[in-house]
Structures are given as structure tokens and as C-alpha cells.
Amino acid sequence: MKKLLAMVLALVMTLSLAVSANAAFEDAKDINATYAEAVDVLAGMKVFQGYDNGKTFKPQGDITRAEVAAIVYRIYTADVKDSYVKNYETYNKFSDMAGAGWAKGYIGYCANAALVKGYPNGTFQPSGKVTGYEVLAMILRAVGYDKNNEFTGTDWALHVAQIAEQNKILKNVKGIDLSAPASRELVAELLFQAIQVPTVTYTAAFGYQDVSLTADKKTDKLVKANSSLGYKNFKLVYGDGTDDWGRP
């Protein structure tokens, strides 16, 4: 059984500090116990930053497409201080960015990196609600999927669900309607599981390949290295100080 996850960041953030991020939310008691660890860790990472200057999390509240773009940006770049996001405000190709305000840079970056897609009419709809499948599509692109455009067409949600299921991202959300608008705590759970998944690369000849398998230069044998976004960008490890394969 997997152990409780903790974070080891550049500033040596510990699990107790991560948990305190959750406890600091005035509405922490309203967070579903199943999703509490996800909220703990992502809030501790500053990927989720809460409302009212971090006082509330609003776990059952709907989340917007703009908010998810901001979260995916932080996970993908590790820029949790949003230091560079303004550089991408002009990257937007969508026609409805005039009212996007604070979210322009996040959306611009994610669109430029092909992590988010707009609608056929050329809009992004930043204030629109987002479904569980849409959240999964965004974060799975960050992991490396959709390079073969499998998240396009009428069956895109089915392909998203298949990949998410294969990677055990859905293990705690059985019975949840992922085609409905997603709550903030559900988004936290989906993202938390996804950032533990090995990143992949794609070639037409070989399809998707797990980049955690790398060649040892000394032995020329394949060895495993933790390639997940959580580990690469945030040094996310288990509570006993080991990575995904039990190594210190």
C-alpha cells in the first residue's frame, strides 16, 4: 500500500507544513476525507491558493476553466509564485480574452504549450465551468498524452477516461460523474493522482513510452527514474522519504 505522500521542496517543506495548509482553511472541515490528502499536498505546494487571501478553499464549489489553467500552469512550470505568468498574456489566440483579466497569462501559456484547447468558435470561455474529463485532458497533456490527437473528436472523453484509468488516476472517484461540472476538491484529487504518473513521450513508430525508463550509461541497461511531474517539479516523495520505487 502506498504511504502518505509528503513534499520535499527547495525550501525543505515537510508533510506537517503541507497539512497545515489545509488546516489553515476556515472551511477545512467541509473537505471530503477522501480528497483531504490531495488538498493538503496541492495547497502546501501553493498550486491551489484558496480564496479570500487563502482563508477558504470552497471544496464543493465549481471551478472555472481559467482557474484550472492557472493550476495546470503551476504544476507544469513549478512557478507557484506566478513570477513569469505576465510574459504570456499576449500569447492568446482566443477571441474572448478581453475579459479574462488575471487569467490571461495562464491561459496564454497553457494554450501555447498545447495543454488547453479552445472551442470551435475560437473562444476559451475562461469563466465557464469545467468537467472532470476536461480537467483530466488538460493534466494528461501535461504528462505527455494527446500527442496523437486522441483527445479530439466525439470519443475524446472515452480516450481520456481510458488513459486515466490505466494510470490509476480514478481510483478514488469511482461512481463520480466526470461529465458534470467538477468541484474544487474533485479537481484537487484528479490533479494529485495525475502528478504521480510517469511522464511519457510519443513517436509514430512506438506510440507512448514511459520516460521513467532510461538507459544507465555504465551498464547500458534500462533503469527506472521517477519522471512524474510531482517529483520532477516539486520533489514529491512518500512520507518515509522514498520515491515511487522505494529509493531515498
Identify the residue ranges that each predicted region occupies:
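Mature N-terminal segment immediately following signal peptide/propeptide cleavage
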Residues: 39-49
